[in-house]
C-alpha cells in the first residue's frame, strides 16, 4: 500500500497494519498518522518529509 492508499483506508474505517498485526497504523486526535505497537510505542507513518514511509509499501496491509 502506498501512502495515499493507507490514508484512504483509515479514513474509510479499515484497520491498516505494518509488517504484522502487532503494528497498527492509526490517525490520532492531532490528525497525525502513526504506526502504533501493541505496547503503546509509536513512530510516525512517514519520515519528517511527510512522504517517505517508515516501512516498505509491500509491508502495509488491511484485514
Describe the residue ranges of each PLM region.
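Mixed-charge, Lys/Arg-rich low-complexity intrinsically disordered regions
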Residues: 1-11
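Short beta-strand-centered aromatic/proline hotspots
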Residues: 22-33
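SH3/SH3-like beta-barrel fold
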Residues: 35-37
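Intrinsically disordered, low-complexity, charged/polar segments
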Residues: 42-63
Amino acid at each position: 500500500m502506498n501512502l495515499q492508499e493507507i490514508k484512504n483506508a483509515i479514513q474509510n474505517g479499515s484497520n491498516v497494519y505494518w509488517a504484522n498485526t502487532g503494528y497498527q497504523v492509526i490517525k490520532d486526535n492531532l490528525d497525525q498518522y502513526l504506526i502504533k505497537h501493541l505496547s503503546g510505542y509509536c513512530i510516525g507513518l512517514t519520515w519528517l518529509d511527510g512522504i517517505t514511509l517508515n516501512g516498505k509499501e509491500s509491508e502495509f496491509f488491511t484485514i
